[in-house]
């Protein structure tokens, strides 16, 4: 595939895509903002602990590959970064809002079921029903310039198959592990996680507002 990202590059791109939609007032992001987003404990799998130098290296590489661009001047005291991975003026990759939400959530959390994706992507795009989630996944799997996602074999005890993005290469289906937890439990967990993410974002916005008022 034309688009190939390392694990850390996928995390950086996913974070910028997420923040562009969920916290536009804080976007583009500084290096520190990207570090914080990459190391979030909510809506991240796996949880990472990247250093500023590690993140800066990824940012530099992605700028060279034209997946990001720097923004400076016009009142910005520090260099900030915005994504050019998709939907940029001169880029080839064009995605709908629904597709961006699913791709972002897959970049940030890895393989997930349609039910998990619907709950976890809700802050970026509100799917009307599960049929819309599944049809969007199928579109991503069958695009002429793709495929961008793949459906994995259903695990024993699971009602839904998981999907994974293909921006980091082909995916090997992991060995099936017998797990009798049902889809309802998975959906409940996903809803709880979505609420935790919303609380964390609200706290971040409050801290930013208080810091601004203190200036």
Curated annotation (Swiss-Prot):
InterPro entries: DUF480 (IPR007432), WH-like_DNA-bd_sf (IPR036388), WH_DNA-bd_sf (IPR036390). SUPFAM superfamilies: Winged helix' DNA-binding domain. The modification N6-acetyllysine is found at residue 80. It holds the Pfam family DUF480. Keywords: Acetylation. It comes from the Bacteria. Belongs to the UPF0502 family. NCBIfam families: PRK11239.1. This is UPF0502 protein YceH. It comes from Escherichia coli O81 (strain ED1a).
């Amino acid at each position: 595939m034309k688009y190939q990202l390392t694990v850390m590059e996928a995390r950086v791109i996913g974070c910028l895509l997420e923040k562009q939609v969920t916290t536009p007032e804080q976007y583009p992001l500084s290096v520190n903002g990207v570090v914080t987003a990459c190391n979030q404990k909510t809506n991240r799998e796996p949880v990472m602990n990247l250093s500023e130098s590690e993140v800066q290296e990824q940012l530099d590489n992605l700028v060279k590959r034209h997946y990001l661009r720097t923004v400076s001047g016009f009142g910005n005291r520090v260099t900030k970064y915005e994504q050019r991975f998709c939907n940029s003026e001169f880029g080839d990759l064009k995605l709908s809002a629904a597709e961006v939400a699913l791709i972002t959530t897959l970049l940030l959390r890895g393989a997930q079921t349609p039910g998990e994706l619907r709950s976890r992507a809700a802050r970026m795009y509100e799917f009307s029903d599960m049929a819309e989630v599944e049809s969007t996944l199928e579109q991503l799997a069958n695009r002429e310039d793709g495929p961008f996602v793949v459906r994995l074999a259903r695990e024993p005890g699971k009602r839904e198959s998981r999907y994974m993005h293909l921006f980091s290469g082909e995916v090997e289906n992991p060995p099936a592990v017998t797990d009798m937890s049902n889809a309802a439990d998975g959906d409940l967990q996903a809803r709880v996680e979505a609420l935790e993410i919303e609380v964390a974002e609200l706290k971040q916005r409050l801290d930013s507002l208080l810091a601004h008022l203190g200036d």
